Regions:
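Metal-cofactor-binding active-site regions of metalloenzymes
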Residues: 2-36, 42-232
Length: 235
């Protein structure tokens, strides 16, 4: 079955609608468009860059591990187990089909925008995503992911990233960051302090996490010790 190709969208689509303002915005953008990327926040696991393995399949890359995507799909009636969330077994192709069937839900969302950008400009998918084109798009992406150009380090270089900040648990040993720095194969990959699981008493496992935090830092099991542990681990 043949399908109409994706329409390449206007290059100014994110700029202001007013013509005068748009021309100024375009001029400003063009001055920095080729500058390297300094990314102060992200969710790229450092292991991706350390191991530099090919991404396994389209679903795990774009759907299963993106909570913005899975939440919207779940709100439309798709079970989280059907999406492979939480370690549940799910066939990647079936996950992709569920996603493609509900692709119109993502119109006007940030997730829809960046997935569209990835499909067109990185993964070279040339058909509009839908239930009818799900398998065609899946196979195209799978073929692309098997190439050296789509491995993590190659993408790091392709995107012009100079600095990438990861999101890290305070008790992470940061061995991956040390290994990358020693190897020097990619730009700077820096850890950032993300103590969320130690700050929300309503979160699952909060008590156990705090106990581990104070134990790892040798702090007393008091509120003052808890604050001291957070301060010590941040340093």
């Amino acid at each position: 079955m043949s399908h109409a190709s994706l329409v390449r969208r206007d290059r100014d689509r994110l700029l202001p609608a007013d013509p005068t303002t748009r021309s100024v915005a375009r001029a400003l953008y063009e001055r920095v468009a080729d500058a390297p990327i300094i990314s102060p926040h992200g969710h790229v696991p450092v292991e991706w860059l350390v191991e530099d393995r090919p991404f396994s399949d389209p679903a795990s890359l774009l759907i299963t591990h993106d909570h913005y995507v899975t939440r919207l799909l779940h709100a439309s009636g798709v079970g989280l187990d059907e999406l492979g969330v939480g370690g549940s077994a799910a066939d990647p192709r079936q996950v992709w089909r569920r996603f493609a069937e509900r692709w119109p839900l993502f119109a006007g969302t940030a997730s829809g925008y960046w997935i569209s950008e990835s499909l067109q400009n990185v993964l070279d998918v040339t058909v509009p995503l839908s239930a009818a084109t799900a398998d065609e798009a899946y196979d195209r992406i799978a073929d692309q992911l098997a190439t050296p150009e789509l491995r993590p380090r190659a993408l790091f270089e392709r995107f012009g990233i100079e600095v990438l900040a990861t999101t890290d648990d305070p008790l992470d040993d940061l061995a991956g960051h040390a290994a990358l720095a020693a190897e020097g194969a990619v730009g700077r990959v820096l850890p950032t302090f993300r103590p969320d699981r130690y700050l929300d008493p309503d979160a699952a496992g909060f008590a156990q996490n705090v106990e581990r935090l104070v134990a790892e830092t040798g702090s007393p099991g008091t509120f003052a010790g808890y604050l001291a542990a957070l301060s010590l681990i941040h340093i």
